[in-house]
Amino acid sequence: MKELKGTKTEKNLQEAFAGESMARNKYSYWASKAKKDGFVQIAAIFEETANNEKEHAKMWFKLLEGGSIKDTASNLEAAAGGENFEWTDMYARMAREAREEGFDEIAEKFEGVAKIEKAHEERYRKLLDNVQKERVFSKDGDVIWQCANCGHIVVGKKAPDVCPVCDHPQAYFQIKPENY
């Protein structure tokens, strides 16, 4: 494919990606509201359309990215960079401007979201480190691994290559969360 950088077509692809992405979110929000309002069929149609918009956005995104979605390590790096921009630049600027215009409550929300974006960046960087050091499915000490498909529990330094209960691959294992 020809080089897109700097072309009107690149700008159009960016606009199409942004438009489809925003439409997907709006339709998802509206589906939730329709369901709460007692319109299950309308909610389902909003969700179906939201999924269509997601696929449209994916098509434009892939073209912007050279035809494919990159590997997980590259995606984690890009995600961390995006989150860094959001908390260090975008939301800081937005909070400052909201305050200057007298919208203190909105400024506080921007600042609150900036803190969340910082946590997102940190999480992505830790995950990237795990991928780069091949520490996603093995740890230095014993941990409790749980199959995300069937719930099987294994204690050890390494997740099994295959779940002995449901035969799903190692990719389905994670350290068992205890957030209850």
Residue ranges and their predicted role:
Residues 1-180:
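Non-heme di-metal
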